[in-house]
């Protein structure tokens, strides 16, 4: 399931090109884009266009709430409920943001090899994070919303994996829990803490938390013929509509590439990453 802003038609198009329906069918995978209502102030998007997109591709689920950052938990829970009800026999539910680059084949291979059992959420675990108290940002959390100085462990919301049974438990608990607007924290932090659901860290190297690393990984596949182990990468701050297409095309054209050696570790040889890390110090890790 792909959380997508109602106006991000170019990103949805990129997902469909990177992973066309024929590929999804061959892997027994269902994809759904999760949208909300067009905000009243938004004049550049028309509902009839969204409905036409839905009729054409049959892969859109649109909620009755407004499209807004603070409603992302509702959107994620809507998707989890839809998946748990309609595909209760599915092995896994994968949630991604529409601007996240990921490899479906790589994710499938990883899950097959790991053979995870029981209720879980798997992704990039964030530990010891603190609430943002700067009211000028969209991540601002007031003391009334959350009084403690540290959040419980949770997963980055750009990509995570769970199961239908886990989703059902979370949906049931969410109805009885005070609402919190940070989707990844609410779903994979507060809910998992209350329900004692385990968080699983993606193996090292499978998640590229900074765009500089993803760009180097893609370039190495194209120009140096070195395989990229990552299955997930995050976009640049200013976005890149076709990033998921570029990433998947590079992976598929690199099936016979050489494996990356320890001496070629991305965090050592990626000059753009090393430069920015040196500039920002420990804040950039």
What does each model-found stretch correspond to?
Residues 1-285:
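Secretory-pathway lumenal glyco-enzymes, predominantly type II signal-anchor Golgi glycosyltransferases
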């Amino acid at each position: 399931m792909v959380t997508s802003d109602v106006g991000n038609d170019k990103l949805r198009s990129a997902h469909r090109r990177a992973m066309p329906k024929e590929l999804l069918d061959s892997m027994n995978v269902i994809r759904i884009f999760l949208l909300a209502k067009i905000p009243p102030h938004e004049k550049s998007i028309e509902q009839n266009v969204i409905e036409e997109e839905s009729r054409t591709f049959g892969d859109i689920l649109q909620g009755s709430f407004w499209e807004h950052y603070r409603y992302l938990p509702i959107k994620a829970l809507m998707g989890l409920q839809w998946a748990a009800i309609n595909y209760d026999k599915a092995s896994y539910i994968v949630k991604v943001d529409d601007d996240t680059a990921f490899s479906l084949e790589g994710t499938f291979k990883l899950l097959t090899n790991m053979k995870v059992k029981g209720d879980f959420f798997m992704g990039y675990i964030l530990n010891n994070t603190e609430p943002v108290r700067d009211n000028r940002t969209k991540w601002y959390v007031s003391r009334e919303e959350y009084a403690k100085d540290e959040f419980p462990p949770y997963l980055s919301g750009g990509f995570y994996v769970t199961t239908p049974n886990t989703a059902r438990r979370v949906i049931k608990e969410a109805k009885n829990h005070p609402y919190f607007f940070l989707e990844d924290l609410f779903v994979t932090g507060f809910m998992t803490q209350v329900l004692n659901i385990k968080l699983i860290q993606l193996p090292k190297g499978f998640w590229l938390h900074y765009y500089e690393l993803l760009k180097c990984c893609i370039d190495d596949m194209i120009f140096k013929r070195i395989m990229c182990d990552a299955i997930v990468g995050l976009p640049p701050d200013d976005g890149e509509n076709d990033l998921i297409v570029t990433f998947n095309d590079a992976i598929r054209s690199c099936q016979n590439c050489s494996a990356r050696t320890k001496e070629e570790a991305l965090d050592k040889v990626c000059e753009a990453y090393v430069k920015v890390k040196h500039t920002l110090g420990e804040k950039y890790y």
